[in-house]
Amino acid sequence: MSSVSPIQIPSRLPLLLTHEGVLLPGSTMRTSVDSARNLQLVRSRLLKGTSLQSTILGVIPNTPDPASDAQDLPPLHRIGTAALAVQVVGSNWPKPHYTLLITGLCRFQITQVVREKPYPVAEVEQLDRLEEFPNTCKTREELGELSEQFYKYAVQLVEMLDMSVPAVAKLRRLLDSLPREALPDILTSIIRTSNKEKLQILDAVSLEERFKMTIPLLVRQIEGLKLLQKTRKHKQDDDKRVIAIRPMRRITHVPGALADEDEDEDNDDIVMLEKKIRTSSMPEQAHKVCVKEIKRLKKMPQSMPEYALTRNYLELMVELPWNKSTTDRLDIRAARVLLDNDHYAMEKLKKRVLEYLAVRQLKNNLKGPILCFVGPPGVGKTSVGRSVAKTLGREFHRIALGGVCDQSDIRGHRRTYVGSMPGRIINGLKTVGVNNPVFLLDEVDKLGKSLQGDPAAALLEVLDPEQNHNFTDHYLNVAFDLSQVLFIATANTTASIPPALLDRMEIIQVPGYTQEEKIEIAHRHLIPKQLEQHGLTPQQIQIPQVTTLDIITRYTREAGVRSLDRKLGAICRAVAVKVAEGQHREAKLDRPDVAEGEGCKEHLLEDGKSDPVSDTTDLALPPEMPILIDFHALKDILGPPMYEMEVSERLSQPGVAIGLAWTPLGGEIMFVEASRMDGEGQLTLTGQLGNVMKESAHLAISWLRSNAKKYHLTNASGSFDLLENTDIHLHFPAGAVTKDGPSAGVTIATCLASLFSGRLVRSDVAMTGEITLRGLVLPVGGIKDKALAAHRAGLKRVIIPQRNEKDLEEIPANVRQDLSFITASCLDEVLNAAFDGGFTVKARPGLLNSKL
């Protein structure tokens, strides 16, 4: 744009005060507006204006940034630039501000400030509305020489730039098309100059003065380019370039000056990264992608956001274990010993691991199986996965999936997103550093689902042996072979696992422990671990097996051993206090009035009884005397028993029966209570029951009504119509727990039969099974867990469906010896087994025979 402004600016202009940058006529600048005065100017003048005149501002440079807008107007620079506001962009982050794109029109001089608030307005005099050259011959000759000299330097500078031929030609045409008097302002704004130098050019109202001040700036720029070209011939370093014009490139390094250490280190890292790519054993497709990305990285300025993203991507690619693996230990005998030492029981699980080792001995390229351990909490599913990795000699990595509801956690984020990263599978491989680790996918049944996708669906490819050799993470965007990874998933139940995902896994049930197994686990693993954690030794505390049994039966009721472990920890803490007190109070123990051995009353007596620990609260034990924990000590440490054998008490009247239920926490016993009263034949069900269990109750009452005469069942008035003038209420205790499922059918029928017959159900019997309207008993699941629950509760007889007889083989031998299992195919057999003396059938009346 020419210095000779084609626009007549208003005589009164609003002033935009800037403290960074200098706008010259003919140049364009972006500036941020965040002070109160400037914000008022933008909102009142630019955003509400409707004419061209309203978009013209007076830009005053070098204005001090005020500490507060409430202060008086700071001193203003005498010369400013009239500017045209081309664009206004607003934002509220991190605070309200506007970004203006303004173009300089001409110089002006402030004659008088007419208003200071809400934004300053001044009377101005437009400058540099001059003729192109003055009329006097001498001045015209001087300006002509200066103009030619300036133009020559400008052309020389353009031709020395490291640019393509078309770009240089375009700049030449631009120089030729602009008026000579406009060139000083325009070139000053685009070459490397300081704000102080630009301010001097702005103050130079005379055209001759501007030429004289600008020519040295061009010469300085040209000399710098010459020096750079001379250095390049010797060093052949194409990475360090000097670009003079700001919109294109900048001088990043001046030859002869000290090199930027960070830049040199970064260049060294890129060289090392390129070397790692060349020497890596990644597949051909991944290698091509890395070569392409490293070429892009070399051409990027370090200030670009994509530079860091690309570098992180390449570093991940070279760190992944594409072909690095560990050698499996295939000694089956050693593996069996290791598994037995780490875990007690779990024979089915150990058998499957040994089978895998045996097949690996016969076939080296066997694909890793996809195992899923299903069982209640606390039975050791996660620790077994760690033991499997230890047995195989592989690296172990656990991935917690509980609550994960974003498929990107599995597949990763695409690199187009800010903060993108690989998924947990690829990140886990990077962590372990080998391509054949043992991955434990913990709590796979607790995966969520959200708007970000379904992570269970993303696992389909990971857990499919036919597909995971070509697994593609969104972040990598190249295939990675997962076929050598041994995936082990854990779950409490298979009900919440999608069928497609469940079909890809080999399910191995991990049932709860029996009381005998818990005692062995406690004395083999839990007690030594707690002693070590609390700094105790076996010489300081002794927990006999009978005490462990009391903890299991009276203070815990679970399928696993977590609560047992916590109770043992509480005992160790209490003993640690006694031991610590004894170490600090040994002098007290040597008092003459204390007889020998009187301070250790915790030892068991000959008849098996002992004095409680609380007897010695006033007298601490010496550290060498062991403390024996018995039931009385348990009451002092753990409080009164939480569970009692109350089965016989709760079955002391008709209308109560015991059922067996399965939960994700293991098997449980379940009481069913029934009561009848005068009414209109309604059936009331309480206890948070699901639809299936409600239907089982209706089936049971319908079967009993149809067989009332057969068993001589009557209501209170003696009628065989059991619901005639009678209401029935069925209740399932523990009302806060949701209950559902068909396996309570036989229990409900037995409970109602007890109610209407007035007979007591045996107090040592529990039952499970689904019923039909015709009285058949159908098979149910979870027989082993239910049997263990009956065994824990001290029951002696368990009634199961006849078609579940095959499941008895999974029950431990000691449990089968303690329990009497009765199989039933119909409700008649169930009732006969549930009542003492059987449930007799009334004889049918004789039938009339006719013979012709």
Curated annotation (Swiss-Prot):
It is an enzyme of class 3 (hydrolase). Its EC number is 3.4.21.53. Residues 651-837 form the Lon proteolytic domain. GO terms for molecular function: ATP binding; ATP hydrolysis activity; ATP-dependent peptidase activity; protease binding; serine-type endopeptidase activity. ATP binds at residues 375-382. The modification N-acetylserine is found at residue 2. A motif (Microbody targeting signal) lies at residues 850-852. It catalyses: Hydrolysis of proteins in presence of ATP. Residues 13-222 form the Lon N-terminal domain. One of its GO terms (biological process) is protein quality control for misfolded or incompletely synthesized proteins. The active site is at 743, 786. It is found in: Peroxisome matrix. The keyword Protease applies. SUPFAM superfamilies: P-loop containing nucleoside triphosphate hydrolases (SSF52540), PUA domain-like (SSF88697), Ribosomal protein S5 domain 2-like (SSF54211). GO terms for cellular component: nucleus; peroxisomal matrix. It holds the Pfam family LON_substr_bdg. Its main location: other. Interacts with PEX5. Interacts with TYSND1. May interact with enzymes involved in beta-oxidation of fatty acids, including ACOX1/AOX. Belongs to the peptidase S16 family. NCBIfam families: lon (TIGR00763). ATP-dependent serine protease that mediates the selective degradation of misfolded and unassembled polypeptides in the peroxisomal matrix. Necessary for type 2 peroxisome targeting signal (PTS2)-containing protein processing and facilitates peroxisome matrix protein import. May indirectly regulate peroxisomal fatty acid beta-oxidation through degradation of the self-processed forms of TYSND1. This is Lon protease homolog 2, peroxisomal. It comes from Bos taurus. The gene is LONP2.
